[in-house]
């Protein structure tokens, strides 16, 4: 009993063959719009530069030095100088959270605009 080999291409032949030509109406638009990428890059830069910059600005300014302009109370000045890295860390954390909330808000606005545009298109199709 001999079995006949099918006339179809083998796996190696199929893999080596060029892909079948697609129609000219294929969709070549990017999966993510460019403005979304630019916003993401901007917020990424803000997330890196903002908190680190605020940390060093706050550390170098002496923490809460604006509370004791011309005070002779040296204990308060000593405590604010000691707490300066702590205050700077808190400032950096607040800055990071503000950038994060800003990104979430901008993404929410973009999503809302897309939903409104989609609902308008659906209303036009229904008419």
UniProtKB/Swiss-Prot annotation:
Residues 12-26 have a biased composition (Low complexity). InterPro entries: Vma21 (IPR019013). Residues 61-88 are lumenal. The keyword Transmembrane applies. Coiled coil: none annotated. Keywords: Cytoplasmic vesicle, Endoplasmic reticulum, Membrane, Transmembrane, Transmembrane helix. Residues 1-28 are annotated as: Disordered. It is a multi-pass membrane protein. The chain crosses the membrane at residues 40-60, 89-109. It is found in: Endoplasmic reticulum membrane; Endoplasmic reticulum-Golgi intermediate compartment membrane; Cytoplasmic vesicle, COPII-coated vesicle membrane. A motif (Prevents secretion from ER) lies at residues 124-127. Residues 1-11 have a biased composition (Basic and acidic residues). One of its GO terms (biological process) is vacuolar proton-transporting V-type ATPase complex assembly. Required for the assembly of the V0 complex of the vacuolar ATPase (V-ATPase) in the endoplasmic reticulum. HAMAP family: VMA21 (MF_03058). Belongs to the VMA21 family. This is Vacuolar ATPase assembly integral membrane protein vma21. The lineage of its organism: Eukaryota, Fungi, Dikarya, Ascomycota, Pezizomycotina.
């Amino acid at each position: 009993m001999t079995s006949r080999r099918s006339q179809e291409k083998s796996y190696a032949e199929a893999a080596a063959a060029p892909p079948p030509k697609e129609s000219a109406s294929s969709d070549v638009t990017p999966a993510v719009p460019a403005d979304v990428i630019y916003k993401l890059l901007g917020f990424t830069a803000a997330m890196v530069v903002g908190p680190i910059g605020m940390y060093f600005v706050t550390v170098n300014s002496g923490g809460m030095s604006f509370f004791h302009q011309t005070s002779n109370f040296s204990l308060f000045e000593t405590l604010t100088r000691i707490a300066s890295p702590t205050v700077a860390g808190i400032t950096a954390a607040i800055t990071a959270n503000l950038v994060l909330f800003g990104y979430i808000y901008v993404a929410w606005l973009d999503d809302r605009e897309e939903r409104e545009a989609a609902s308008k298109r659906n209303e036009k199709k229904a008419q």
